[in-house]
Amino acid sequence: MQSSSELFPVALVSAELRGDLSEDVYRLKPGNSPDSTVELAVTRLGLAGQENRGVPVILLHGSFSNRRFWYSPRGIGLGPHLARAGFDVWIAEMRGHGLSPRNQAYKHNSVADYARYDLPAIAAFVRE
């Protein structure tokens, strides 16, 4: 569980045990975008009680989707499969999707914004 960052403000929204998995949900406020209201939800999956995690993997959903594409409420999907295989799984939710709140300029969000601002911030947080 990571509850802070030296890069930008981070809040631990929830820390849950779901069967054999641990699920930590973070809200990042990178502040690197022209829209300062952007906040990004990132879910970290791992095996409950496992201290040492493997290679990090970041999963991104497609348009009109959210983290549930990779991780169902019943613990099924690629995310849990990778976590059970020993990977350090991070599931990002883009601006205004899933647990990421809508930002002020929500109607103007673009894939270019995700690539230029959001993905580098998520990768830096995971790397930290």
Annotate each predicted stretch with a short phrase.
Residues 36-40, 88, 118:
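A general secondary-structure boundary signal
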Residues 2-6:
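Flexible, low-complexity segments
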Residues 108-127:
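Alpha/beta-hydrolase active-site loop
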Residues 47-101:
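Short, surface-exposed "cap/lid" segments of acyl-processing enzymes
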Residues 100-108:
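Surface-exposed, active-site-proximal loop segments in enzymatic domains
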